[in-house]
A protein has these predicted regions:
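Active-site microenvironments in enzyme catalytic cores
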Residues: 1-8, 19, 38-231, 238-243, ...
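Short, charged beta-turn/beta-strand-edge "cap" motif at the junction between a beta-strand
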Residues: 9-11, 88, 149-151, 261, ...
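Short beta-strand-centered aromatic/proline hotspots
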Residues: 15
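Short, surface-exposed secondary-structure edge patches
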Residues: 78, 133, 250-252, 303-306
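Residue-level recognition of short, solvent-exposed, well-ordered loop/turn junctions
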Residues: 82, 255, 308-309
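A beta-strand-loop signature enriched in Asp, Gly, Thr, and Trp
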Residues: 211-263, 267-280
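Active-site pocket scaffolds in enzymes
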Residues: 260-309
Length: 339
């Protein structure tokens, strides 16, 4: 099943989207918002699934042509947004870039930070930035949305609470990160609002691509119209989504609508190297910080700048038949405040 949120008020209006993303139908009579649906998932899911089947068969009353520009992030705001960092190659590169050591517990204890969830960006909203000097970066990721998760669940139990999957652009201000982390209290100013794909899908919608709590498909990223990366999301993810959810719930409950991220999707070279740009025959990257560090390693100097005002990033995922699964994150960086 595929769900989305029309821009309407602070929490939007829930709609159901056809498998090919061409049509949609309202679901407000079943649940007014996605948050409401998640809070009563077991009760409303059968009705949503029935209408989804009707939509795909062409028999849903009130169906309309879908315009992705009318969509907010599936949850325009959430009670919880916690982002992991489950890809070893990304962790190694960004830590090397700021001369930080790998944590000894990386292989057994996930990295995770708590982000701002009070006002997510829509997938086609501008990324407003105060200054280019802050080091504006995109991060292509995957995230899951849960229902109510009890405290201290096991990964096996956590898997049952994962209801939806979506993509993320976790915007980062790289120039602010070292100073903030040096204080020993984590990210804050360095992590402005994130955006999410216009469509959230149930795990079964991914078919065989959803295995062991991971999405086994490439994440496609374009920067200013040029392919920047297409790393595989599955094989190099050290911790699965059930493990990340269990980690987040180790000492606390997670309320329905909690969003848990994978961290930046990243692949090393087959020989263990840090990866190559698309132009050099590699799978590329899902963020600028990685390519900058690789340039430093390979060429002795950084060639790629961080994002500037007017730059545009596009993040998508396609199935093996070339069909867009989640819709498209398509954002331009603009100066704040606007003139």
């Amino acid at each position: 099943m595929k769900l989305a949120t029309l821009k309407q008020g602070r929490d939007g209006e829930l709609i159901i989207v056809s498998r090919d993303l061409s049509r949609a139908v309202s679901a407000v009579d079943i649940a007014p918002t996605l948050q409401a649906a998640l809070e009563s998932w077991d009760a409303v899911n059968p009705q949503l699934e029935e209408r989804y089947a009707q939509l795909n068969s062409g028999s849903a009353e009130g169906a309309f042509k879908l315009d992705q520009r009318a969509l907010h992030s599936p949850l325009p705001r959430a009670y919880q947004w916690a982002d992991g960092s489950a890809y070893l190659n990304h962790v190694q590169l960004v830590r090397q870039a700021r001369n930080a050591e790998m944590p000894e517990t990386f292989w057994t204890d996930p990295l995770m930070y708590q982000g701002g969830s009070d006002c997510f960006l829509a997938p086609t909203d501008d990324i407003e930035a105060v200054s280019e000097e802050h080091g504006i970066d995109f991060e292509g990721e995957i995230a899951v949305i849960t229902d109510d998760v009890p405290m201290a669940v096991t990964p096996e139990q956590a898997a049952k609470h994962i209801k939806l999957v979506m993509l993320v652009n976790d915007v980062s201000l790289r120039g602010l990160i070292p100073g903030e982390l040096a204080k020993g209290f984590g990210f804050f100013q360095a992590k402005p609002a994130s955006s999410f794909s216009p469509i959230a899908v149930t795990p079964d919608e991914l078919g065989d691509a959803w295995q062991d709590g991971k999405v086994h498909l490439p994440l496609t990223v374009h920067l200013n119209g040029e392919k920047f990366g297409e790393p595989e999301a599955g094989p190099d993810m050290i911790f699965s989504f059930p493990q990340l959810v269990a980690h987040a719930a180790k000492t606390r409950y997670l309320g329905a609508g909690a969003v848990i991220g994978s961290g930046t999707v990243s692949n090393p070279d087959p020989d263990g190297g840090p990866g190559k740009p698309v132009a050099d025959g590699g799978v590329g990257y899902s963020c600028l910080a990685e390519v900058r560090m690789v340039e430093q390693i390979l060429y002795g100097q950084v060639k790629t700048p961080f994002m500037r005002f007017g730059d545009r990033v596009r993040i998508e995922m396609f199935d093996r038949d070339g069909n867009n699964i989640f819709g498209t994150i398509d954002q331009q960086v603009v100066k704040y405040p606007p003139k």
